[in-house]
Amino acid sequence: MEFSTKALDWSKAGQNGFLATKTDCLVVGLFEGQNLGGVAKALDVATKGLVGRLVKQGDFEGKRGTHLMLHEVAGVGAARVLLVGLGKEADFTDKAFADAVRTAVRALSSTRATSALWCLAQQAPQQRDVSWAVITTITLVREAGYRLLERHPGLKRANAQNAASGKPNGNDKSSLRKVVIAVDSGDARAATQAAVRGTAIANGMELTRDLGNLPSNICTPTYLANTARSIAKRHKLKAEILGRKQIEALNMGAFLAVTKGSAEPPQFIVLRYDGGGARQAPVVLVGKGITFDTGGISLKPGEGMDEMKYDMCGAASVLGTIQAVAEMGLKLNVVAVVPTCENMPSGVATKPGDVVTSMSGQTIEILNTDAEGRLILCDALTYVERFKPAAVIDVATLTGACIIALGHVNSGLYARSDALADALLQAGRRAMDTAWRMPLDDEYQDQLKSNFADMGNIGGRPAGSVTAACFLARFTEKYDWAHLDIAGTAWKSGAAKGATGRPVPLLTQFLMDRAA
């Protein structure tokens, strides 16, 4: 889908003005109430009071979540006019704006419209600027239009069979191909940059969703490594992929312990984007890449285990984020690090009670092989010390306990530094990809005590997400660090099953803020 921005003079709406633009659909927002303003007022004048009459007669009240499609409206160049309800102006929040965008996309998806002049960006919430409105519009429109993995042969065959039998396949794309986002003339430059950034973020989210949604027999550790190579080649990043022998040479005993049960070779992926100059310390993103998690010898229940292909969504989001950063050309140095493997049971798999030595030299008693994410991450967190990072953020579908604590709304955020935590929280709010800060009190560390090693890899049922973060904290004392537990936000179950692309919006906004 192609997005662009266009600066319009709202005082010249009709005749040769923007309302005369030839397009398949003109999208206009209306607040609830009798008073028309902005684009709605201009449209009303150009159509000789049509909009006002619709409101007065109660045919369209502008209530949130509602819409009205008009066809062949006199005085308008568009084939259709879509009126979108914005609700009460006093209650027009970020979420209300997002709801309006989604309402418009749903309405357009039931038509054959291929192009739209989008006049909602000027009606962003008061505290938001045009850049926010444009980026949010693009990411939400692309998110709503996402369809799963059509390039893969197996899915193509299934789609062809469904089409032949008249069955819906869930991969039918809407007709919309071109969206022109209208902005005020004074916002032209900011809007143009925002369109580039919004497209990059949407591309990163789609990559993240694709990788997460792929079945684990396709998206193996090797597949992730090849994806990283492809990103590096397209965007001129530096790529280094370490195999088993190199991982062994680095003494990554914790990571290797997880890999033992699987026939799939582990990979350790490093991508470097150098946009900030040689002297700038990089921000390092570390993503958990368990491409399938059975739990190992501590086997998970069979029901719902298919969703454990999503246990690499941390890795997927890190790859999606660095791709977005490269597409945006941010003046920032960013490193993406992904330890990736499967967690499988076998005759040679790691057993509960085994003791291993991590890259840091600290020993770990593996009390539960299903607490494997922290084992691959701890060695990665030691490895990244060599970059002398400005900050390190690890991203992982780490604990079911985080879902119990926060549900599927907020990602769990852990950080020692208030400044880093606040920056991430603020970025999440702006990107509508929110997180909630969780505790890291030293008292929780007591739960990780072991009689046979420096620590156990679990701390019991109480505060399970917290103790997992406390485990990681032991390997991050040499730099500023934050941990995002995305177990509740990386994918959805049920009818809407699939990867969400989170926390790419949060991470990209955080990096844009640092680069500003």
Swiss-Prot record:
Pfam families: Peptidase_M17 (PF00883), Peptidase_M17_N (PF02789). It is an enzyme of class 3 (hydrolase). Binds 2 manganese ions per subunit. GO terms for cellular component: cytoplasm. Its cofactor is Mn(2+). Mn(2+) 1 binds at residues 293, 370, 372. The active site is at residues 300, 374. It comes from the Bacteria. Presumably involved in the processing and regular turnover of intracellular proteins. Catalyzes the removal of unsubstituted N-terminal amino acids from various peptides. This is Probable cytosol aminopeptidase. The lineage of its organism: Bacteria, Pseudomonadati, Pseudomonadota, Betaproteobacteria, Burkholderiales.
